[in-house]
Amino acid sequence: MWNIFKNKSGQSHKVKDKFQLDLDNIPKHIAIIMDGNGRWAKERKLPRSLGHKAGVETIRDIVKECNNIGVRYLTLYAFSTENWKRPKEEINALMELLVNYLRKEVAELHQNNVVVNTIGDVSKLPKACEDELMKAYNKTKNNTGLVLNLALNYGGRDEIIRAIKLMYKDIEKKGLDIENVNEDLLKNYLYTKGMPDPDLIIRPSGEQRISNFLLWQCAYSEFWYSNIKWPDFKKHHLHKAIKDYQNRNRRFGGV
């Protein structure tokens, strides 16, 4: 089955829809825990760095497909606050991959109307990474298509603590009544301010945990797990996850 439709930028797309997706019920926000790169490499007796490199190829394909089918926000868990515990050589390889990805891909992402955004404390990343992220954002910030959130040096608990500290400073400065502190106010201090919570969170590789990812935002997200490791995750796996999402009844605590 082929579907022809227009995205937010008015561009026409032709998509082979194996799972007969309902294009009127595409998740606005998909978040992915990109897991399994290291184990993928180990199974092939390759260095872990080559697993991460293979994972970058998957990013390219999934970003393109999400943009094609009308997803508005795609958040990729790229490097957590806990990932600093990994060997220094692996961390350096990941940072180099990030820089190379941005340098190679930003022009095409910009051409495809994608916004490149970051969530997390990027000030602790190497300067080359921080500089390339800023360049990518400045180049794409006025685009109107898919918003690609790269979660870097990100942790859900860290984000909530940061938000509370920022909110407390404003309460002191502006003299806000503590009784007016509510969910809507706190959301304004999260990295994802102004974005919808993720409708669908995908985790490949066989692991079934949240790993400190979008803890505040995932309260009513639908979760989809797969044994496929991230470097082997293809467009049809994305379609299957979305189809499963479309077959669920989201009640948000109701009946």
Swiss-Prot record:
CDD domains: Cis_IPPS. The active site is at 35, 83 (proton acceptor). One of its GO terms (molecular function) is manganese ion binding. The keyword Transferase applies. Substrate binds at residues 36-40, 48, 52, 80-82, 84, 86, 203, 209-211. One of its GO terms (cellular component) is cytosol. Signal peptide: none annotated. Pfam families: Prenyltransf. Coiled coil: none annotated. Its cofactor is Mg(2+). Binds 2 magnesium ions per subunit. Mg(2+) binds at residues 35, 222. One of its GO terms (biological process) is polyprenol biosynthetic process. Catalyzes the condensation of isopentenyl diphosphate (IPP) with allylic pyrophosphates generating different type of terpenoids. Belongs to the UPP synthase family. Homodimer. This is Isoprenyl transferase. It comes from Clostridium tetani (strain Massachusetts / E88). The gene is uppS.
